[in-house]
Design a protein with these regions (language model features):
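Strongly charged
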Residues: 94-95, 106-156
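Ribosome large-subunit tunnel/peptidyl-transferase-proximal elements
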Residues: 1-81, 88, 131-158
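Mid-chain, well-packed structural core segment of small domains
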Residues: 69-117
Length: 158
């Protein structure tokens, strides 16, 4: 499916936002029936020191076998997996909600051609969700999803 085929109701910018907070709001909107596109997933952040965050992901990756469980390495897939954990994905309602979410590395909507349109016909700008921004942290320790992906061995294409 190309970018143009997914007509999002809302575009969310995840740049410098906390992954879990954005994912929970995106999951709720998807469950409410909105089509949500999340852009700049590689610039979203996970709080905690890089050593702590990477140890969790490495331990998760080491457990299991060739058959699974398999965990994503790309930042857009890591973000979508976080959203999946917040919807009842084994039920029809959750599967449909997960289908209403698209996560992108970078911003395919920046040119305005495929952007969702408002009531006046103008392209809708990507919004930053309330209470998700990194500036609300008193803790300075965080790591971006792009860095996590790179350390997990993903091919850096962003």
């Amino acid at each position: 499916m190309s970018y143009a085929e997914f007509e999002a109701d809302v575009v969310v910018d995840a740049r410098d936002c906390i992954v879990g907070r954005v994912a929970s709001q995106v999951a709720q909107r998807a469950l409410d029936g909105e089509r949500v596109a999340v852009v700049n997933a590689e610039q979203a952040v996970i709080t905690g020191s890089e050593e702590d965050v990477m140890s969790v992901y490495r331990q998760r990756d080491a457990v299991g076998s060739d058959r699974g469980p398999n965990y994503p390495k790309r930042p857009d897939r890591i973000f979508k997996r976080a959203v999946r954990g917040m919807v009842p994905y084994e039920k029809t309602r959750g599967r449909e909600a997960l289908g209403r979410v698209r996560v992108y590395v970078g911003n395919p909507y920046k040119d305005g051609a495929a952007s969702p349109r408002g009531e006046d016909g103008e392209a809708v700008e990507a919004e930053v969700l309330e209470d998700t921004s990194l500036d609300r942290l008193s803790n300075i320790k965080f790591v971006s999803l792009g860095d996590v992906s790179e350390n997990l061995g993903a091919n850096v294409t962003w």
